Amino acid sequence: MADKSPNNAAHFTSALRLTTTTTITRGSGGGGGNGAHHLPQAIAHRGFKAQYPENTLLAFRAALDEAGAHALETDLHLSRDGVVVLSHDGNLKRCFGIEDKKINECDWSYLKTLETVREPKQRMPRLEDLLGLLAEEGREGVWVLLDIKTDDPPAELLGRVADVLASTPGPVPWNERIVFGCWNQPYITHVRTILPAYPISLISWSPLYARNFLTPKQPNLSFNMFQKSLVGPVGKLFIRDVKKNHRQLIVWTVNDEEWMEWSIRAGADGVITDDPELFREVCKRWEGKGEGASTSTSTSTSAPSGEREADTDEKARAARRTGRVRDGTWKRTARLYLEVAGIQVLVAVFTPILMLVARFGVVGPGPKAAKALKL
């Protein structure tokens, strides 16, 4: 299970410090460099998406209880009658099999009846349903990254979010557990205006564009970057400057073990992944590489009941690992880096357009651009 210390979330939201409390003293076998190294936190992308229908309460619970994720990532949309719901897509086709309908064209009374295409059938949750899950006893240390999609007017969406946060009590103030992910300056400005006490993470696929936000004029802001855009010298310089400015770095969406290991070596503070269980396993292997690995947690993540169920849990994990273990061949490595090369060509071509659009304010760059680039 994930850390249950309230400091897990509070440290992130107050100082935007994402790293786990496990410290590894690395030698040459630990990925390069010496000295103490903190493992990134496991952030479950739309919940435990690798195993369950995405953005459902089942996927969120499984991410925490089965995979041991430290945090959840999900997406915000607004129904026609003003209910804040959790869905990556603005339409209902892919996840719910409904053609030619958008979320903002439907009332909640209709949306709540839909079931996912993927088994086991689940219903679309609201933001208040997720907050209810986070308010359960023992989950005080879990935090959540809310990706604000750009299909809805930001003032209306964030106003509704503010109402939900104000009307849903929790054991820890929500501004110590919630981070808003924004794709562009207009949405950052709206969060700072409507929810000024909440931290923000810039979501971007371009390190050159994101560099514009490495300024004291953008306080309380971390970076949530497309991982494959950071491979290579441009990304390395960006990571260096992020750390030099004492900002935190999250990378998305990391599902290959090689890129998980790369993210640890690069010093990422959080890793967004469809498979948080696999990432936790990679982190455990990484701990084993360290010389004199030590753990300094304020509370233990294990319990006697958890120990009694360890054998059953391990069998379940082993079954899930079937078919996803990397083959370690040079062909796989070549394929991964060729894929990165192709993506970086697209990023290089479209970044100037992105920066011009942002500069002249024609339209704020958002997730649709990332979708167009197939990132």
Can you describe what each PLM-predicted range is?
Residues M1-L375:
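Phosphate-group recognition and catalysis centered on beta-loop-alpha active-site segments
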